[in-house]
């Protein structure tokens, strides 16, 4: 896209996330050797340079970019020599970030529902009509999906277009999600589960075969 458009400036601006949960902290890419899909701005810029494009613009929260017909002006909220500090000392930066937000994160998780609701009935009422409208997507998913949570296993029957209890039915996909988080996502009627749940990495998953874009699209 950059080559086709011929952009004078390329701004990496979609991440990376910061995983501050203690059990997810290892998902942060710190040394570059981690099994992570979340590189930072500096890695993006290096990749651009390897490809022969020096138009990438370094940015951090608060960076302002002014674009005119003759120039691209970048103004950072800190001195230029401080811009790379979070990246050059990433472990210490993230550990401090985690400590600063620990109480807020604990308070936020405490807002998740503690009571159990009838998730199967709620999801069937919500998703049943959507599944009925999407026969081609259901066929493309190609199998059932199990959602395991505390005290409950839910089966999304894409072939039949219903949400029912899981009782050993054949399936190609499985998610395990903590009940309070799942209850919160369902209660809010989250339209895009990728942003509301999956990008947080607060779940585990299993699949048979290749990644299926259609299943992901259903949750979006």
PLM features: residue spans?
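Feature captures hydrophobic
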Residues: 58, 63-220
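Acidic carboxylate-rich catalytic motifs and surrounding loops in phosphoryl-/glycosyl-chemistry enzymes
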Residues: 13-17, 54-65
């Amino acid at each position: 896209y950059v080559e086709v458009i011929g952009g004078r400036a390329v701004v990496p601006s979609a991440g990376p996330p910061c995983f501050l949960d203690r059990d997810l902290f290892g998902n942060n890419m710190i040394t570059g050797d981690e099994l992570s899909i979340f590189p930072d701005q500096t890695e993006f810029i290096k990749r651009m340079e390897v490809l022969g494009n020096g138009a990438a613009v370094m940015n951090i929260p608060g960076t302002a970019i002014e674009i005119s017909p003759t120039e691209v002006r970048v103004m950072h909220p800190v001195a230029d020599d401080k811009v790379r500090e979070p990246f050059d000392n990433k472990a210490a930066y993230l550990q401090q970030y985690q400590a600063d937000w620990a109480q807020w994160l604990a308070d936020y998780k405490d807002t998740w529902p503690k009571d159990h609701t009838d998730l199967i009935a709620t999801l069937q009422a919500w998703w049943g009509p959507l599944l009925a409208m999407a026969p081609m997507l259901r066929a493309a998913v190609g199998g059932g999906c199990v959602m395991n949570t505390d005290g409950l296993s839910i089966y999304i029957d894409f072939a039949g277009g219903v949400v029912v209890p899981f009782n050993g039915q054949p399936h190609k996909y499985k998610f395990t999600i903590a009940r309070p988080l799942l209850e919160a996502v369902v209660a809010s009627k989250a339209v895009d589960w990728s942003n509301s749940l999956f990008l947080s990495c607060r779940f585990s998953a299993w699949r048979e075969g290749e990644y299926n874009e259609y299943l992901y699209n259903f949750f979006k």
